Amino acid sequence: MKQLIFCLLLFSATAASAELPSATTSMVKQTLASGKPTVIDLGARTCIPCKKMAPILEGLTREYQGRANVLFIDVREDSAAGDRFKVRMIPTQIFFNAQGKEVNRHIGFMDKTGLIKELKAAGVK
């Protein structure tokens, strides 16, 4: 039984480390200047809806590699980002077109279908 608990703890620690890293200010600036549509998810690793979105965002990062950017910012680690993007609740997803202009914003959990719809509206082909 102890081995099973240890394995489960080890697996959960490994799964947690697979999450998207929290983007820095310089990463955000670089990404928005990349010429690709971008979604930035502002949340926290401790927020339940944010945790549910993490695997969706990771999947979109792989699925849209080279066509769109997917970033995550933990506003509990980087509260200045929450202020800079005027986040009132988490999670908040902000969509930017290829020119780096904000084109839409959503507050709350967003499923994969909704994220893809908004990325396409932002210009992803």
Protein language model annotation of sequence segments:
Residues 4-12:
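Sec-dependent N-terminal signal peptides
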Residues 20-37:
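A short beta-strand-turn-helix
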Residues 35-38, 42-46, 89:
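Short pre-active-site segment immediately N-terminal to redox-active cysteine/selenocysteine motifs
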Residues 51-63:
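Typically the conserved alpha-helix immediately C-terminal to a functionally engaged Cys/Sec
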Residues 61, 66-79:
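Thiol-based oxidoreductase modules, predominantly thioredoxin-like and allied folds used
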Residues 86-94:
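Structural micro-motif
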Residues 98-125:
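Non-catalytic, surface beta->alpha helical segment in thiol-disulfide oxidoreductase systems
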